[in-house]
């Protein structure tokens, strides 16, 4: 009976798909022609940027304060806000952008890192005959192709595998994926294909083998989201937009329209978050592009304005790279609760996510342990039982807030729109909300079109289709080779610089410090296991980085890849930034504390540390307890029952290992559960038990004590009969 239902369902879907194919095929040629014409038109009207390099931050602030009136003021420095600024300034409009935090500090840096058309939206469009969903997918696929073209250094096509565990699913999903290719038309990245079970396991050897039928592989795009956002903002700055981070809007300015007698929004009162200085920025039009905080700006305009944003939290986790193949992702289309989970390689690590749950609006979202465990359980369902998915392998975790919106002009005020909404208030405030990363450019185009119409601005047509972003124009896949040959950088570092900065990588390489080694000649790393170098800190300041958090999370992506590595790099990053920005010792200490707090709460360190508590059960075999107790007493020579930093220093001196005192304090603090400045035997056994269970991994104290024990054992005096002595 179930089989018959499945067959009927498949036949129904295939029939509907065939009808859709016939309908779409009629306009396929026309659509392709229109896209090509649009690209040619855009290419023909592109002008060169006003500035070869983005102006300094100080110059941007002076422009903001001294300009009598802008045509457009954009509030919000995420992908959409930066996109609006770029769209407006390239049309010839005098443009300003202000952001209360850093560019991409909110939702735009906490995505799944995909540039996708929304394959699941296409499924809904077909099953429910939803034209809006279809148009959204069609638009997103066009924007996907454009984004891959204008920022080739920051983005690339990624094959994604859809494992099939039931025979009837094969034709069902195959038809859907092929339709995805068809809707993309000339913008299709690569054609999807079917894999047999053996070929699927060859590509993804850690996949669950039992009942596996085969797999379907389709292509979407992947990018470095925070760097992409920054590239958009920097490109806008090069074209003449006055862009400034750490400028918070505290109120909207209004003036009376002489023609209508009504009050109109005419700018904003801004506050310098770093200094407290307040000043006015006047503009003919103000655009609200604040994502999840859309309603807070709307209420500045009208405190009776109804809320249109319904925030939803999406949690992601990062695991070691060996959890996924280097060049193929995985999609679980139907999790235990009906959600979709992606499992993707990114920056030599593995991203898994996402969740979708209602949340309260906050500037500092915290990933919950419940969501982290949900993702881990879904990962376990798809990976072979030979692969132990451990809680301790979660190297970073974050929560991003999706700004789901209700169209205030829709008859159904309870219906959430998955598309974007452009709203104009009675006083002329223009709000852009909703949408997704992939469609930021078309959202910006719609918003600026509306601004021009509502405020009678004189501007040219949209010019952002095919407009290269910062670093993209002269990039090539072999650019990194020149970095190796011309500057003496490591190949891994050179590849990282090329794919992060594009054709601007040479400027970073010029700043690189000599290593003092035979090879590499230049490029001192911030941490040994990642290709980030010290020169990037200096260059990051040119990219408007103001704080240590900016540097570890958005100029580099250390915080999103490994929170422990980010914490280790922090002192050096603060030292380098302090030297460039002339920070006092008090400011340096404050930056360290703020960045450490950011890692603890927002990047998953809190959840990770809670895996080891004073209530953690010790479940070790007697032989293990004996072995670990012996190891502990290598440090606790006086058998006090606890060890302090002095005990650790004494042992390290015996094996000629030098670690600075601050680092040692940090290492012991990770395990010191009752925070009394010493690690007791019971705490050490709790740590080793948690490591065995997989709840904790990478404990620096555990690694240090094991290494010390091995070195001490090697230094046991050699017996006389092994030293060629005696009879």
Curated annotation (Swiss-Prot):
<feature type="domain" description="EF-hand 1">
    <location>
        <begin position="623"/>
        <end position="658"/>
    </location>
</feature>
<dbReference type="Pfam" id="PF16901">
    <property type="entry name" value="DAO_C"/>
</dbReference>
<dbReference type="Pfam" id="PF01266">
    <property type="entry name" value="DAO"/>
</dbReference>
<feature type="transit peptide" description="Mitochondrion">
    <location>
        <begin position="1"/>
        <end position="42"/>
    </location>
</feature>
<dbReference type="InterPro" id="IPR036188">
    <property type="entry name" value="FAD/NAD-bd_sf"/>
</dbReference>
<keyword id="KW-0677">Repeat</keyword>
<keyword id="KW-0479">Metal-binding</keyword>
<dbReference type="InterPro" id="IPR018247">
    <property type="entry name" value="EF_Hand_1_Ca_BS"/>
</dbReference>
<keyword id="KW-0496">Mitochondrion</keyword>
<keyword id="KW-0809">Transit peptide</keyword>
<keyword id="KW-0285">Flavoprotein</keyword>
<comment type="similarity">
    <text>Belongs to the FAD-dependent glycerol-3-phosphate dehydrogenase family.</text>
</comment>
<dbReference type="GO" id="GO:0006734">
    <property type="term" value="P:NADH metabolic process"/>
</dbReference>
<dbReference type="InterPro" id="IPR006076">
    <property type="entry name" value="FAD-dep_OxRdtase"/>
</dbReference>
<dbReference type="InterPro" id="IPR002048">
    <property type="entry name" value="EF_hand_dom"/>
</dbReference>
<feature type="modified residue" description="Phosphotyrosine">
    <location>
        <position position="601"/>
    </location>
</feature>
<dbReference type="GO" id="GO:0004368">
    <property type="term" value="F:glycerol-3-phosphate dehydrogenase (quinone) activity"/>
</dbReference>
<dbReference type="GO" id="GO:0005509">
    <property type="term" value="F:calcium ion binding"/>
</dbReference>
<comment type="pathway">
    <text>Polyol metabolism; glycerol degradation via glycerol kinase pathway; glycerone phosphate from sn-glycerol 3-phosphate (aerobic route): step 1/1.</text>
</comment>
<feature type="binding site">
    <location>
        <begin position="71"/>
        <end position="99"/>
    </location>
    <ligand>
        <name>FAD</name>
    </ligand>
</feature>
<keyword id="KW-0597">Phosphoprotein</keyword>
<keyword id="KW-0106">Calcium</keyword>
<dbReference type="GO" id="GO:0005739">
    <property type="term" value="C:mitochondrion"/>
</dbReference>
<dbReference type="GO" id="GO:0006072">
    <property type="term" value="P:glycerol-3-phosphate metabolic process"/>
</dbReference>
<feature type="binding site">
    <location>
        <position position="683"/>
    </location>
    <ligand>
        <name>Ca(2+)</name>
    </ligand>
</feature>
<protein>
    <recommendedName>
        <fullName>Glycerol-3-phosphate dehydrogenase, mitochondrial</fullName>
        <ecNumber>1.1.5.3</ecNumber>
    </recommendedName>
</protein>
<feature type="domain" description="EF-hand 2">
    <location>
        <begin position="659"/>
        <end position="694"/>
    </location>
</feature>
<dbReference type="InterPro" id="IPR000447">
    <property type="entry name" value="G3P_DH_FAD-dep"/>
</dbReference>
<feature type="binding site">
    <location>
        <position position="676"/>
    </location>
    <ligand>
        <name>Ca(2+)</name>
    </ligand>
</feature>
<keyword id="KW-0274">FAD</keyword>
<comment type="function">
    <text>Calcium-responsive mitochondrial glycerol-3-phosphate dehydrogenase which seems to be a key component of the pancreatic beta-cell glucose-sensing device.</text>
</comment>
<keyword id="KW-0560">Oxidoreductase</keyword>
<dbReference type="InterPro" id="IPR038299">
    <property type="entry name" value="DAO_C_sf"/>
</dbReference>
<feature type="binding site">
    <location>
        <position position="672"/>
    </location>
    <ligand>
        <name>Ca(2+)</name>
    </ligand>
</feature>
<dbReference type="InterPro" id="IPR011992">
    <property type="entry name" value="EF-hand-dom_pair"/>
</dbReference>
<dbReference type="Pfam" id="PF13499">
    <property type="entry name" value="EF-hand_7"/>
</dbReference>
<feature type="binding site">
    <location>
        <position position="674"/>
    </location>
    <ligand>
        <name>Ca(2+)</name>
    </ligand>
</feature>
<dbReference type="InterPro" id="IPR031656">
    <property type="entry name" value="DAO_C"/>
</dbReference>
<feature type="binding site">
    <location>
        <position position="678"/>
    </location>
    <ligand>
        <name>Ca(2+)</name>
    </ligand>
</feature>
<dbReference type="GO" id="GO:0019563">
    <property type="term" value="P:glycerol catabolic process"/>
</dbReference>
